[in-house]
Amino acid sequence: MSIRERLSGNEASAVAMKQINPDVVAAFPITPSTEIPQYFSTFVSNGQVDTEFVAVESEHSAMSACIGAEAAGSRAMTATSSNGLSFMWEMLYIASGSRLPIVLSLVNRAVSGPLNIHNDHSDAMGVRDAGWIMLFSENNQEAYDNLIMAHQIAENKNVMLPLMVCQDGFITSHSIENIELIEDEKVKEFVGKYQPEHYLLNHNEPIAVGPMDLQAFLFEHKYQQAEAMRNAKKVILEVADRFEKMTGRKYGFFEEYKLDDAEIAIVCMNSTAGTTKAVVDDLRNQGIKAGLLKIRMFRPFPVEEVTKALSHLKAVAVLDKTDSVNGAGAPLFTDVTSSMYTQNVHVPTVNYVYGIGGRDTTTKEIASVYKDLEKIAETGDIGNPYRYLGLRRRGE
């Protein structure tokens, strides 16, 4: 029987970590993820977990400690945000390239500079090619659920890759919502004990690893890493199926909200999906066939599945909470459009950059995007495909 609680996203994440009871947690505080290791350290002090909690002097050291723990055959977790993730950047590639299934709770925040402590997705998108599996969470419940599923995905012998669970800073991390927790024993059974077949620092299987990997082998090693990322798709669905049987909550690569008969749709991630659902409901009451595709699994990107879900539409808008500053489109937009192109599907698609630095995005603004899509669907004219939503113009 599930346990009804009222928790913030950070509290929910810390509770998930407590129930997982990893061997090692190494962390350095940074807003807005600070509360996760703070709450978890209380669990350690109270004897509710037997985790080795390592309070380090920087985020670089936090990831380094997790790498050392996983290399020694231990289950390791951490949490960070924004420039903390940036400081880990070097070690993120070492973690994935060494095939270490570390789990990271990433509370999304704008990357400096200028300094901003509020939410956008510039931190996550800055490491989208670092070889980490990336799951995004609309609300506190999903942040909790994704963390519970994370180890079973990352530690699968056909995957063995690190995984980050993303949630929106402050919007999700500090907002208190009703949430259904799973009983401790059920989580323990679901997550299981970490017993890797092989690990790098096994004294019974001594090897040299890490110092040098040149032309003779690196290409093949990176190919195997890419294959593991592709393998993760199947594993993510298998783990989600087990999770649904335990909780009744269903997860996939994405969520389709009133998309089956839709003519126009928005694609987005994280908490903005909740705002968009409210707009879709309102438009449906007006007789407008609007829908939503909420991406949950961003890495690996579900190319074929996203394309199939969007192929029947007359117009699509992709909302990005960061800007690539490349003149060609923001990250989610380029993934969606390249997916459709490679599958020979041509749906008029436009990009909206929104919410930079935590700027609120209102239902009125989301409704204006659907209004634009109606015009595109009617005329076939995309106009400027690279747009900004909620941007103040000079003098405003």
Identify what each model region corresponds to.
Residues 259-288, 301-308:
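Redox- and metal-dependent alpha/beta enzyme cores, enriched for Fe-S-associated oxidoreductases
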Residues 79-80, 103-107, 136-137, 164-168, ...:
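Short beta-strand segments
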Residues 1-126, 131-132, 148, 390-395:
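Thiamine diphosphate
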Residues 118-162, 166-169, 345-359:
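Conserved thiamine diphosphate
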Residues 320-396:
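Peripheral docking tails and interdomain loops at the edges
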Residues 162-255:
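Conformationally flexible catalytic loops at phosphate/diphosphate-handling active centers
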Residues 8-13, 241-264, 277:
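Glycine-/acidic-rich phosphate or pyrophosphate-binding loops and their flanking alpha/beta elements
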Residues 41-46, 278-292, 341-342:
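Short helix-loop-beta junction
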